[in-house]
C-alpha cells in the first residue's frame, strides 16, 4: 500500500532544478559567476529527502508488522511499537508540512 507514495513527483529531490541553470545563465549573461564557498553540512533538500524516506520506511515497517500481527507471526508489543513509531513519523511530517505552508503564506503576504 505505501509503495504508491514513491511514485509521487513531489518526493523527487531534483524535480524543478533543471531550470535553475538556465535562469542563472539568463540573469548573468551566460557567464558563470563563481564565489568560493564551503559546504558546511547537508543541503536542505537532502535533509528533507532523508526525513521523508525515514518516514516512509517507518510506515512500511508498521504495515508489515500489522500484517504479521494479523497472521499471528508477531506479538502485540512489536505491532504497537511499529505503529507508534509510524504515527510519530506521520506527526513529524504533518508538522513539517504545516511549517512549510505557513512560511510560504508569510512570503506571499510580503509586499514587494
From Swiss-Prot:
CC terms in the record's Gene Ontology section: bacterial-type flagellum basal body
Domain of life: Bacteria
Keyword Transcription regulation: no
MF terms (GO), sorted A to Z: cytoskeletal motor activity; structural molecule activity
Main localization, broad class: other
Subcellular location: Bacterial flagellum basal body
Record-linked InterPro entries: FliE (IPR001624)
Pfam families: FliE
Protein keywords: Bacterial flagellum
GO biological process: bacterial-type flagellum-dependent cell motility
Homology family: Belongs to the FliE family.
UniProt protein name: Flagellar hook-basal body complex protein FliE
Gene name of the encoded protein: fliE
Amino acid at each position: 500500500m505505501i509503495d504508491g507514495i514513491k511514485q509521487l513527483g513531489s518526493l523527487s529531490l531534483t524535480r524543478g532544478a533543471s531550470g535553475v541553470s538556465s535562469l542563472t545563465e539568463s540573469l548573468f549573461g551566460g557567464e558563470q559567476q563563481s564565489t568560493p564557498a564551503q559546504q558546511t553540512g547537508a543541503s536542505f533538500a537532502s535533509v528533507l529527502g532523508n526525513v521523508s524516506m525515514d518516514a516512509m520506511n517507518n510506515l512500511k515497517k508498521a504495515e508489515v508488522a500489522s500484517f504479521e500481527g494479523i497472521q499471528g507471526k508477531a506479538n502485540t508489543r512489536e505491532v504497537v511499537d511499529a505503529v507508534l513509531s509510524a504515527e510519530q513519523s506521520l506527526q513529524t511530517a504533518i508538522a513539517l508540512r504545516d511549517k512549510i505552508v505557513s512560511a510560504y503564506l508569510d512570503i506571499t503576504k510580503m509586499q514587494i
